[in-house]
Amino acid sequence: MTALLYYVQNDTDGAGHRLPLSQRRLGRILSLLTENGLSKIDREINLLPAGHPAKGPYGLFLQAKENLRGNIVIGLGKRLNVFQDKLVDALTADSSIDLTLPGHKPCAYFCILSAQDSTYAFLSSLFFTMIFSRLEQYARRETEDGKLPIPVNFVLDEFPSIGKLGDFKRSIAFTRGFRMNCIVIVQSIAQLADMYPRHEWEEIAACCDATICLGVNDLTSAKFVS
């Protein structure tokens, strides 16, 4: 996956110019696997110049036994199968959403998710992971005091439905320093512990200065608020 990401991200046309973003999208990785096959991908990677970022990860992939490589490709294809949905492919084909806008202009972004179907949870997880990162970068690079000009409030209702956020325990710990505030809303502590196991959920809860409990129906939540 890493090798193909680097390959697609840095792909160029015949004149050596990078392809448009719409042709360097995540859905193209699925196309490479289903339309080209592993043998053609081998040839394409071999033609890349020395030092290309795709060569290193692909070299590690080639160290696996041949039958294992096939299983890796099949597994990757299954995980990327969601990109057969044209709407998902189109949504990830460009970067029209300004992730830094909330930090310097009053606005509101709404992410409407299904609480029952987790098929597209990776998209919401990616969105929130990226917006935390971009706002942090904006505060560090574009402001004198390292703080966002406009405070950004994240109301994370049905938090587990968002999908697991990469290194969220770190994000929620540093956000206030950049004028970002998180309101984490869950139906039970057990939900949070299931999504962020091994005491990670406790670190997240510890970063919340205030806790409001509207009622509990499980022992784990009851013990936490008692």
Regions found by a protein language model. Name each.
Residues 114, 159, 187-189, 216:
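Histidine- and/or cysteine-centered catalytic micro-motif in compact active-site loops
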Residues 110, 182-184, 212-213:
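Structural recognition of the beta-strand scaffold that forms the well-ordered cores
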Residues 175-195:
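Sensor-1/coupling segment of RecA-like P-loop NTPase cores
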Residues 1-180:
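P-loop NTPase motor domains
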Residues 5-6, 100, 106-107, 169-173, ...:
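P-loop NTPase motor core of the ASCE superfamily
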